[in-house]
């Protein structure tokens, strides 16, 4: 497992993680909206409930929240909150979709500013 935590990654009890999984609470950069000039935050907590099973080669991105007793199928990429009770098996579909428009990475002005107390106040 590869873990990149600059803000908050929390695991419930008895979580199992398969080999070559990646868990990140950061994008390592921000994105700029070309219309408004505003930037994305670039980080968000990752919360994994108890008794979850993360299959091999899964990628868990910022903003992911898994309720208890969820299984991520091998190779799944997730970056969102799963609502409701757990006991779900989650897998990606083969459908490709555009998730945001009018954003780009502005090189040289894409550093993330993390809250100073984000590590100490979990």
Regions found by a protein language model. Give the residues of each.
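Short, catalytically relevant binding-site loops at active-site mouths
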Residues: 8-9, 30
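Extracellular beta-strand scaffolds
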Residues: 9-10, 23
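A contiguous pocket-lining binding segment that forms or flanks enzyme active sites
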Residues: 11, 17
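Glycine-rich hexapeptide-repeat left-handed beta-helix
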Residues: 18-122
């Amino acid at each position: 497992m590869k873990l990149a935590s600059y803000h908050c990654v929390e695991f419930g009890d008895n979580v199992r993680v398969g080999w070559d999984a990646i868990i990140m609470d950061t994008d390592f950069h921000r994105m700029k909206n070309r219309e408004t000039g505003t930037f994305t935050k670039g980080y968000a907590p990752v919360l994994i409930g108890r008794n979850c099973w993360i299959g091999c080669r899964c990628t868990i991105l910022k903003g992911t929240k898994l309720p208890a007793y969820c299984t991520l199928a091998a190779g799944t990429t997730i970056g969102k909150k799963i609502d409701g009770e757990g006991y779900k098996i989650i897998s990606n579909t083969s459908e490709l979709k555009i998730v945001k428009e009018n954003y780009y990475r502005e090189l040289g002005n894409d550093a993330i500013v993390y809250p100073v107390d984000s590590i100490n106040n979990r």
